[in-house]
């Protein structure tokens, strides 16, 4: 999901954290402008959100360009004709969801699926 900083941020954060067990990789995209934080208790809302979601070992915290670069790497993945392996020609690991399992397609490697 995508969420503006003043659009039920705490709700979306809790929903994101409530995922359990093995799961499909997800993206929670939070957006807004820094000048908006001076209104409606914005700094407190964002700081509370960051405290709640921060420090999680299984969450990747990324900037816009990092997300873009990651998506570009995923788009370059090369799958075998029978889809039993994938080659990752990029310098960045990519993560796939295959048959209910999360699979790491290591940078520069062929990964069995």
Region spans (language model):
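C-terminal domain-boundary segment and adjacent tail
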Residues: 13-110
């Amino acid at each position: 999901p995508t969420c503006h900083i003043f659009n039920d941020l705490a709700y979306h954060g809790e929903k994101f954290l409530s995922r359990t067990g093995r799961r499909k990789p997800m993206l929670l995209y939070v957006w807004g402008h820094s000048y908006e934080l001076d209104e409606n208790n914005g700094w407190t809302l964002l700081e509370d959100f960051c405290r709640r979601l921060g420090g999680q070992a299984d969450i990747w915290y990324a900037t816009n360009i990092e997300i873009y670069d990651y998506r570009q790497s995923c788009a370059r993945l090369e799958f075998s004709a029978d889809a039993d392996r994938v080659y990752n020609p990029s310098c960045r690991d990519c993560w796939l969801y295959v048959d209910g399992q999360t699979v790491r397609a290591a940078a520069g490697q062929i990964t069995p699926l």
